[in-house]
UniProtKB/Swiss-Prot annotation:
Keywords: Cell membrane, Hydrolase, Membrane, Protease, Quorum sensing, Transmembrane, Transmembrane helix, Virulence. Belongs to the AgrB family. It comes from Staphylococcus lugdunensis. This is Accessory gene regulator protein B. The chain crosses the membrane at residues 49-69, 82-102, 104-124, 163-183. Its EC number is 3.4.-.-. GO terms for cellular component: plasma membrane. It is an enzyme of class 3 (hydrolase). One of its GO terms (biological process) is proteolysis. It comes from the Bacteria.
Length: 188
């Protein structure tokens, strides 16, 4: 990992020199590159494991639902990169596989989706210390999180099993990250 960090550092310095950037701008670029590369590797690992377990489509549906709601609702993050990898594998590979394999009832998953929707209404958007939400954006993000959730609830009525359950799972995973129990007093 240190070799990758050195390459990122070198590339960020190159961009700093080429574009005459100050130190703060350099730090932002370096952080952006680190986050982008880290997310790329997490995606490769998650979807690679999903391919190995023949759950690629299930993982994709659950992950996309989660992503589209999270885009506006925000929510808690894993405490470390390793924990993030583990959570990704459990939440986006093992859980979708379990829902399909054990044929979780669609009525139960609709109930779960409505509970998730209520949590989204109550707690979205949920800012963190590292990702604060500007006050003038809060209302718009809340509205968009609710609207995208309604779209998914309606979509659930028109898709077959197990896709309906996977959409509900994606909403539920995101809703759980909004709960106040995941935020310390200093984080909010």
């Amino acid at each position: 990992m240190k070799a990758i960090d050195k390459k990122i550092e070198r590339f960020a310095r190159y961009l700093q020199r080429q574009n005459n950037l100050d130190h703060i701008q350099f730090l932002k670029i370096r952080l952006g590159l680190q986050v982008a590369l880290g997310n790329f590797f997490k995606t490769i690992v998650t979807y690679g494991v999903a391919l190995l377990f023949h759950t690629f489509l299930y993982t994709l549906i659950t992950h996309l639902t989660y992503f589209f709601v999270r885009r506006f609702a925000h929510g808690a993050h894993a405490r470390s990169s390793l924990l993030c990898h583990i959570q990704n594998l459990v939440l986006f590979v093992a859980l979708p596989w379990s829902i399909v394999h054990f044929q979780v009832s669609w009525t139960f998953m609709i109930f779960v989706a409505f509970i998730a929707f209520i949590i989204i209404i109550c707690y979205a958007p949920s800012a963190t210390k590292k990702q604060p939400i500007l006050p003038h954006l809060r209302k718009k993000k809340k509205r968009n999180a609710i609207l995208i959730s309604i779209c998914f609830l309606v979509l659930m009525l028109f898709v077959s099993e197990p896709y309906m359950q996977l959409i509900a799972l994606g909403m539920c995973i995101e809703a759980i990250t909004l709960l106040p129990i995941f935020f310390s007093k200093e984080e909010t």
